[in-house]
Amino acid sequence: MFCHVDVKISSKRYTWTKLPLNVPKLVLIYLQSHFVLFFFSMCQSIWERPAIGRATTSSASWMVGYDCLL
């Protein structure tokens, strides 16, 4: 199982590919003096697209999406 993780914070984009998700993974991002913690559970047997989370702080906004396939 592999995942494509796309994280966009403000105008900067960070991408991880081929993350093995045979076990739950924990991704920690430190950017612009903010800690953003993402927990990716095991992918289901179907496409999960998109799984999007959004949040806004006083100085930055972030968006994350991930696509999973077997």
From Swiss-Prot:
For this UniProt record, the keywords arranged alphabetically read as follows:
Membrane, Transmembrane, Transmembrane helix
Q: What ranges are annotated Cytoplasmic (topological domains)?
A: 1-20
Q: In which tissues is it expressed?
A: Highly expressed in B-cell lymphoma and lung cancer.
State where it is primarily located: membrane
The answer to whether UniProt assigns keyword Nuclease to this entry is: no
Segments spanning the bilayer are 21-43
Membrane topology summary: Single-pass membrane protein
Does Membrane show up as a keyword for this record? Answer: yes
Instruction: List the Extracellular topological domains.
Output: 44-70
* Gene Ontology cellular component list: membrane
The entry's localization annotation reads:
Membrane
Disease field reads: Feingold syndrome 2: A syndrome characterized by microcephaly, short stature, and digital abnormalities including brachydactyly, brachymesophalangy of the second and fifth fingers, hypoplastic thumbs of variable severity, and cutaneous syndactyly of the toes.
Note from the entry: The microRNAs that are encoded in a MIR17HG intron stimulate growth of cultured lung cancer cells.
Please identify the protein, giving its name as recorded.
Answer: Putative microRNA 17 host gene protein
